[in-house]
Amino acid sequence: MGKAPLASASIMKSLLLVAFAAMFTQASAGEAPWTPLFNGKDLTGWTPKIRGCKAGENFQNTFRVVNGVLKVDYSDYPQWDNRFGHLFFTKKYGHYRLRVEYRFVGEQLKGGPSWAFRNSGVMIHSEAPETMEIQQDFPSSLEVQILGGTGQGERTTGNLCTPGTHVEMDGKLDTRHCISSKSKTFHGDQWVNLEVEVRDNRLIRHLINGEEVMSYSKPQLGGDAHAEALAKVAGDKMLAEGYICLQSESHPVEFRKIELQELAP
């Protein structure tokens, strides 16, 4: 008789574990699957827009696929000549998680700006490549800025830059162009995992190797004439969706996984 309570407790514990496992399975089953945006073979589904060129023109094969890796490569460039570029995925998104694996390799192209050393970005809530002006450097968007360490000192990644946009931080409008995250520094050519969680214009979170390094809300167009023109056409300055694109800023960078999970509104 004295052992009966222990047996009952053991049974209850087992039942609770089964219940929690069932709940987790149901939650997982209710989530959308992760979908690759990059097929590992070619640039199907992606459109380049490089400064000085029309949308769709991949100047000097800047964006290329080699051995299953999407490379931003400048080996065919005669010189930099301010050829800032972006590679746009074909579909707009507003509620999603995005996962990207990236690393910096090689040397910066001669003539590239000093601030662009081991510097690139993943743009979200972006305008379309077709609405960019021919000589426009960056699309109006939110740039999840990715930086590589210089070999000494600290240099965070997963930062935020805001070409043609503003956001709210801690409930207040923040008009700074670039805002540092609280990430670690990643030197050398190691692969880094970037994840971005986007809940239309309510909340956006940046995660590096699984750790949240930044969050903000209420992204909106503003800060230059082009962005204000986009807002006028849209009838609203608030950004609830947009395109995803990868950046080229004069330093070679590689992406080997780009996948997205759509979220319920």
For each of these PLM feature ranges, what is it?
Residues A29-P265:
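Carbohydrate-interacting regions of secretory-pathway proteins
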